[in-house]
Every structure is written in structure tokens, then in C-alpha cells.
Amino acid sequence: MKGFGSKVIRSLPNGARLICADNTGAKELEIIAVKGYKGVARRLPAGGVGSLVFVSVKKGTPEMRKQVLPAIIIRQKKEYRRPDGSRVKFEDNAAVIVTPEGSPKGSEIKGPVAKEAAERWAGVSRLAKIIH
């Protein structure tokens, strides 16, 4: 895991629903915790592109449902700014399920992956077909 080159807005709080963009059998995920979040009293922990979050599988195969797993956010709808001044946003919020070490559990990632997530997580960039 590496540090960020740009400031990504953390726009996905606890309770946010994400699409699972890999082939692990999960379809919909709900964020239940954000690893490394240090916040203010009564403020919901939130994650953004490249964040490691813990999710509960809400929809998917019977073996995957109701499990709590680590995941990495690879896309978010809320736009964020890159150091060159460009702004980036995607059409959905998506994550990929990973092992505790940070390597993806699935063997493919559907759709584009944000450059910030690919730079930070080497395992995710290996499986990504499109890095945007």
C-alpha cells in the first residue's frame, strides 16, 4: 500500500451501498467500517477511492451473503480533483473484495478503476483492465 498523490474526497459514509465489481459472487456491499479513520465525535466514518473498508455482503450467492469482509473502493460518484487540476467522477460507487493483506479475492475486475486506487494497491492494478 502506498500513499496518495491527490486529495480524494471521502464521500462514502458507513451505511453506503456499493456495487461489487469483481467475480467473487457478491453483488451489493454495505460499508460498516473504514480502516484508519480518525474523526470527530458523532461524525460518521467515511471512505473514498482507494480506502480500505470493511463491508457486509447484502446481495449475492448464499455462501457470500451476511459475511463481513475487507474491500477497496475503486470508483465513486462524487467528483474529486487531481493535482493537474482535472476533476474525476464515475457513474457508480464500486468496490472489490480483498484478503486482509490487500490482494483481490476475485480473478477479474469489471469496469474502470480509479488511478488513485490502482497506484495505492498493486494487486488491484494487476487485475484492472481499464485504469481511468
Swiss-Prot record:
The keyword Ribonucleoprotein applies. GO terms for cellular component: cytosolic large ribosomal subunit. Keywords: Ribonucleoprotein, Ribosomal protein, RNA-binding, rRNA-binding. GO terms for molecular function: large ribosomal subunit rRNA binding; structural constituent of ribosome. Belongs to the universal ribosomal protein uL14 family. Part of the 50S ribosomal subunit. Forms a cluster with proteins L3 and L24e, part of which may contact the 16S rRNA in 2 intersubunit bridges. Binds to 23S rRNA. Forms part of two intersubunit bridges in the 70S ribosome. This is Large ribosomal subunit protein uL14. It comes from Methanococcus aeolicus (strain ATCC BAA-1280 / DSM 17508 / OCM 812 / Nankai-3). The lineage of its organism: Archaea, Methanobacteriati, Methanobacteriota, Methanomada group, Methanococci. The gene is rpl14.
